[in-house]
């Protein structure tokens, strides 16, 4: 069994959440499959984005309203539980955040996390569960950060959070490395930056209004809240940027910058660079970055597509397609860097291409 460490918030960000993906989040497609009880507050709240909130004096027919999962008192079983299907095909796990915000006097005294790999939800009844995080104490109204000393050896499709014996938990984050399922044919185009391909944002200049990891998740989202947005800049020459480690080294054939829902706060223009680097997070000013998309104006609520000059045509879903892609046909890249000028919001960043090797 891997050793478990209790980390501070800053250490958890530095070691875990900035390097791995929350594989159960609702915005990624994580889904509650079943639970033992949710008398006071729904289990689905556990995997919602954003920090939990408190509305003092608000009641439901079951009792005081809580932004989290809360079970009834006096559980006759050792623990209450909830089973969650990952938002990716499967993943290995490195750590978790358990937030008991606003649960004080009714918080979960202890938790554990288990995982299993099944082909179908109907197989869960006979599934074999493996311990990921052992039974660990929790305190009232606080964020708890637990990390393994190594990724789990096995990938999991579902996880089970237990609370002993009952009570409330506001949020549950589970960080790990998605297990990408790549097509056998290396010439098949895939989104190398997508979270399901193993893409992850490893560095950024700012994420004041919206997190950079939103750039790589499925779909176009529902509002500005599920994109990447930086604060307003006040200095001449300012730019913001994000560096994405691709899920696999590959050739870049097509890039998409989607400004969906960003109407008065989209970037004036963008550039895209790429690099082949042995470093997990190469410096944003590394001289080896190569220009892939030169400075190009953007517009509000649009899918901007950038393709090679020799490409036959672009995607029918794009609002605007430009044949401006450079350095893309014969070079292998491991990372891509999106720069927005001078600041603003972008919903999604896609880097389509072909893997360099199996």
Label for each model-derived stretch:
Residues 1-77, 94, 101-117, 123-125, ...:
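Juxtadomain low-complexity/linker regions and immediately adjacent membrane-anchoring helices
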Residues 55-73, 81-85, 125-142, 219, ...:
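Acidic/polar, low-complexity linker and loop regions
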Residues 85-89, 130-168, 239-241, 246, ...:
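Beta-sandwich interaction modules
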